């Protein structure tokens, strides 16, 4: 049921409707047992937070920071802050001290909510460098706070400031005064170039996004929605809040690396995901099939072929499958695909929005073939996530990012850049009029930085404009497209394509070391460490053969001619990845200059 009211009162309005129905399923800090809270219970917690914030002197449109993993406390803090017209600024739990310091000072944050020990320790170290900071509020009760830290309190103590709702009349007055022009969030994006900017997201953007999403991705109150990505990620934030407007139950996954176990334990019907999640699902399933007997392999390959014909060649194009094909698919769906979905914890799968990077057509077809509705989409922080997406139950094309959501205007510039206008587009960047002016055309269209085109009403993306490489031979290379094709290999964990102003394409590759070590032992390849594996000619030849197989469909000038295996992962700490785990090519070029140059020696 749609309940697109102002976020300042959403939880309370839903509590009137759903009462003691389950709203949040979660695990306590450090505990593996799944618990739940009802709409009524969360509403009461949110009221206490709103009252506590007023007791601390929080003012309308004041910025509050949340530096935490996903948690019940995180969700409640958002709503409690909106209940007094405050602005929340979410930080990634992996943010560096330098990033935190910049965001706190830029937004003049007085109160910073933190999750676990790592976040508390970082916040404490930068406290004296942030003149505006007054208090650190710690969610996890097991965090060891310094005995010499008078500026930190536990969340439980903070909540007591709101006991008996001493300021409830003022809270309700503020909610009555709340405007859709109020800022709800400021999301700082570092991007792949390292420049940090705060994207302003007013309540009006959320309101428009919820209305549009309801017409293409219809969540219902019976859905159980897994929150996999961090709430700092605009895709998860927009998606989770929209699902709450529909009365769905939220499953709060605190640590992304544990999501597959969480899915098996909680059986979600929906979840927003990035392509890398589905790539790992694909590799895991296919690896298990390859290890099975010959009969099982033949059966599964046949089932995939039937699933592809039924779901891709017919249903995706809006056509009715032949009766014989449909009957065979239904039989295989009950006997083969249902077992795969059950193993993944997706036996109740409804649909799964997917965005954040390019999706390999191979992986997308696999997911659809086994009976999971993957709804590919496109969006940015500045567009409050969704710009376009596949619409549930309607035809779609593998390789596109779907049709535009309602209210979005699109234009493709002469340079091929996707330009956007509409009620879900940000008004600009916090404290950065210069960046705001540069981000929009004279007639108000937002410059996405993405190259793309429209075909038959669907949007197709080609590459980030700034990421396009030009080889020394004058050929243009789209590195993300090449990377997405190679990442489906079970032995490849991370990859960075090199080509700009070079005579051919090369790549830095981090293997999946547990699998590579297993391969080496099975083939009597001696090694004492990862460096020896990376340099072993037999390992390199095996990787070369797999890469050549995957890139057969690429143009000759797009194919990786040489590669280097690296013994260590690209890391956040070295600045090689953004907080959303996208590679920073400039930093990689600097950090691995020696290895790159070696690949281009004649």
Task: Please annotate each region the language model reported.
Residues 469, 494-497, 503, 540, ...:
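Conserved C-terminal "lid"/linker of ANL adenylate-forming enzymes
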């Amino acid at each position: 049921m749609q309940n697109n009211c102002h976020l300042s009162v959403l939880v309370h309005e839903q509590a009137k409707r759903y009462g003691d129905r389950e709203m949040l399923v979660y695990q306590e800090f450090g505990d593996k047992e799944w618990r739940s809270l009802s709409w009524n219970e969360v509403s009461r917690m949110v009221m206490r937070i709103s009252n506590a914030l007023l007791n601390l002197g929080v003012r309308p449109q004041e910025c509050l920071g949340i530096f935490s993993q996903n948690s019940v406390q995180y969700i409640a803090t958002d709503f409690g802050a909106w209940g007094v017209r405050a602005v929340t600024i979410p930080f990634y739990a992996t943010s560096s001290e330098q990033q935190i310091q910049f965001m706190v000072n830029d937004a003049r944050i007085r109160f910073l909510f933190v999750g676990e020990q790592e976040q508390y320790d970082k916040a404490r170290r930068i406290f004296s460098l942030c003149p505006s900071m007054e208090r650190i509020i710690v969610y996890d009760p097991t965090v060891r706070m310094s005995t010499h830290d008078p500026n930190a309190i536990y969340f439980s103590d903070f909540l007591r400031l709101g006991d008996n709702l001493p300021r409830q009349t003022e809270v309700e007055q503020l909610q009555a005064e709340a405007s859709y022009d109020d800022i709800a969030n400021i999301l700082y994006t570092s991007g792949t170039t390292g420049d940090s900017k705060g994207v302003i997201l007013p309540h009006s953007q959320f309101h428009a996004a919820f209305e549009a999403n309801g017409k293409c991705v219809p969540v219902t109150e019976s859905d159980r929605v897994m929150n996999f990505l961090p709430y700092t990620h605009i895709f998860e934030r927009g998606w989770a809040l929209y699902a709450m407007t529909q009365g769905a139950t939220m499953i709060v996954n605190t640590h992304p690396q544990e999501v597959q176990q969480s899915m098996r334990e909680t059986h979600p019907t929906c979840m927003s995901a990035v392509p890398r999640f589905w790539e790992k699902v694909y590799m895991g399933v296919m690896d298990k099939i390859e290890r099975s007997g010959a009969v099982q392999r033949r059966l599964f390959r046949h089932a995939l072929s039937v699933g592809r014909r039924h779901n891709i060649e017919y249903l995706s194009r809006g056509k009715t499958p032949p009766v014989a094909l449909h009957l065979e698919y239904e039989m295989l769906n009950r006997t083969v695909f249902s077992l795969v979905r059950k193993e993944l914890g997706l036996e109740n799968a409804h649909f799964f929005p997917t965005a954040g990077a390019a999706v390999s057509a191979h992986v997308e077809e696999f997911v659809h073939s086994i009976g999971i509705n993957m709804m590919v989409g496109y969006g940015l922080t500045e567009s409050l996530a969704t710009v376009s997406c596949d619409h549930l139950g309607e035809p779609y094309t593998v390789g596109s990012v779907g049709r535009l959501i309602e209210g979005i205007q699109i234009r493709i510039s002469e340079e091929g850049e996707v330009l956007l206008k509409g009620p879900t587009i940000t008004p600009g960047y916090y404290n950065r009029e210069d960046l705001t002016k540069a981000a929009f055309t004279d007639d108000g269209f937002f410059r996405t930085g993405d190259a793309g085109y429209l075909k038959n009403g669907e949007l197709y993306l080609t590459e980030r404009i700034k990421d396009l490489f030009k080889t020394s031979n004058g050929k243009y290379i789209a590195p993300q497209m090449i990377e997405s094709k190679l990442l489906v290999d079970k032995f490849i964990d991370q990859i960075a394509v090199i080509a700009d102003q070079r005579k051919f394409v090369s790549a830095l590759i981090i293997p999946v070391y547990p699998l590579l070590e297993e391969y080496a032992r099975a083939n009597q390849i001696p090694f004492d460490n990862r460096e020896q594996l990376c340099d072993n000619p037999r390992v390199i030849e095996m990787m070369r053969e797999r890469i050549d197989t995957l890139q057969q469909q690429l143009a000759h000038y797009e194919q990786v001619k040489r590669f280097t295996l690296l013994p260590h992962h690209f890391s956040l700490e070295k600045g090689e990845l953004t907080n959303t785990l996208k590679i920073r090519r400039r930093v990689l070029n600097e950090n691995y200059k020696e290895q790159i140059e070696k690949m281009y020696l004649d």
